[in-house]
Amino acid sequence: MKTLDVHALHEGIQHTIEKLDKQKQQLEKLEKSVEHLAGMKDALKGKGGDAIRTFYEECHKPFLLFFGIFIDEYKKVLKQTQHAISSVESNSHGMIAEAFLSHDARHGVKHAREVTEQLTDAVNRQTSAIDHIVSLPTVNDSFFRMETEQAERLISDTLNKLFQFDGQQTQALEAAKSDFQTMKKYIDQLETMYTGPKIEITGYKSGSILKSQEEENINQIFGAINPQMKQADDSPMEMMLKKLAENEKSKVDSVVKTGDSKKVSKNIIVINGKVYNTSEHREHIKTDFSNAEVKQVVYNDTLYNVYISGNDMKLEPVVSLSDIKVDENGYVKILETAVELTGVYDLFKAATGRDPVSGEKVTGKDRVVASINSVPFAKIAKLEKLIDINKLINNGKKAKKASEVKNVAKDKGKIANDVSGSANKINSDLIKKYARDIEQRTGRELPKNQIDKLKEALRNKEYKKMSPIETAKHRTKFDKVKNKVIKEWEENTGQKWPVYKENVVSEKTGKIIRKKGDKYDAHHIIENTFGGEHEWWNMHPAKFPNEHQAGIHGTGSPANELFKGGKKK
């Protein structure tokens, strides 16, 4: 039986909110400590040091961010509950008890009505017995009946409000309950992995925290969680990353709606998502940029172009984004895509022997999210024309000569060829082998127009393995366009996307992980983990698990050879 004690509930909610506020303050301090530890590159060196920093970066930081979101959302639900109480009982010291209303109150009203009806009938019988002697009016109890009916309606309405309030607030807490269970599972997983007589976090491997216990025996390509595995037993970290990605998008949406117009300095360059001020560096060589290659960057509230011509580049603001209408296919998409000027980061690192982020830092800038695609190594081999690299090196050592940089860039390009498949041998033989393997395992052919598209992509684009957070964001984007992409696949291939004819049940948990009538898994031929396009030509239906996880992603797949060298170390 449900009971609403307004005063006690208000006090309980307020006490909980105060505790959450204290936890949030402690959490923020802990986040700063973890951030500091993860950034101790000078103190934590070598493989062991890198493993420790990676462990805290991947295992602790996302959890703390997720916990912070949980606190904010839980507080929001509690405050909504406080506000909703008045719609049920306006008295701050009121009390509603289902047991009393359902039994005592209803029985009392019913008993009063029955007694009144009996007395009315008795009186009317007596008056009718003497109506030949004296004329007396009959007793009318209709008014009392109306009052009792109104009382019964009030009881029913109050109970309905109580049930509705209870149901709505319980439903509102479901998300918080689910997030709490996710955090609990994650803590249990960490305890299993890193609790014992000897904790070996110095041997932690990047991305291993994404693996749930049920997935430990699944052999997957590239050693990462397949973004297409949409099932109930996703790892806790993967579920947290997905929510963090969604939360990041909501922040982007709020940024889009702001009306502040900010002027962007032209004297900046983006390297691996970091902004460096080049105002103190050399002026651009006079170059004709009329036929230059154009890339786009979003910085603060302004979109600007990067012009690349030969060995020179320049930046030019285009428009304030707060002055134009945007949607998920425009500005939001730009903000959510890559944050790295591919090639410049590796070239800088190769030329100087140092991480540009750990070099001399210039004036800090606001948050930057860039959508610059890869820049050919040949076009940035003489980066010192734009930036005096010496000024970004702590010890003042001179950068390698331009010729040395070109050689390094050439070697880098060779590695990129191994990843992207631009070598002739891979394009002509290995891609066909990979395609035939997919066809053989799934029993469905890849049409020529699809294979041609895949060859073109692998020739012209360099695919690199993404970080867990980048992979989660990439997966979230695909979830939004999956049905559209499948429809385009059907239109372009002339085939019908197959569906499961019966439920697929997990052998370990007994849970239904694919329902009858659900579409087959959408396999990214160029892996999602490597930034494979969410396009029809990069999709192929695969049945879980034999055709997909244990098939295309299984041991011996040509994909392992096709993307050989692409993994980050």
Curated annotation (Swiss-Prot):
Transmembrane segments: none annotated. It comes from the Bacteria. InterPro entries: HNH_nuc, LXG_dom, PT-TG_dom. CDD domains: HNHc. One of its GO terms (cellular component) is extracellular region. Residues 548-569 are annotated as: Disordered. Disruption phenotype: Deletion of the yxiB-yxiC-yxiD-yxxD-yxxE operon has no visible growth phenotype, however it is out-competed by wild-type cells. Induction: Expressed on rich and minimal solid media likely in early stationary phase; dependent on DegSU. Not expressed in liquid LB, but only under conditions that promote biofilm formation. Residues 1-235 form the LXG domain. Keywords: Coiled coil, Hydrolase, Nuclease, Secreted, Toxin. One of its GO terms (molecular function) is toxin activity. Residues 8-91 form a coiled coil. It is found in: Secreted. It holds the Pfam family PT-TG. Toxic component of one of 6 LXG toxin-immunity modules in this strain. They promote kin selection, mediate competition in biofilms, and drive spatial segregation of different strains, indicating that LXG toxins may help avoid warfare between strains in biofilms. Mediates intercellular competition during biofilm formation; disruption of the operon disadvantages the bacteria, but overexpression of the cognate immunity protein restores growth in competition with wild-type. Probably interacts with cognate immunity protein YxxD but not with non-cognate immunity proteins. The interaction inhibits the toxic activity of YxxD. In the N-terminal section; belongs to the LXG family. This is Toxin YxiD. It comes from Bacillus subtilis (strain 168). The gene is yxiD.
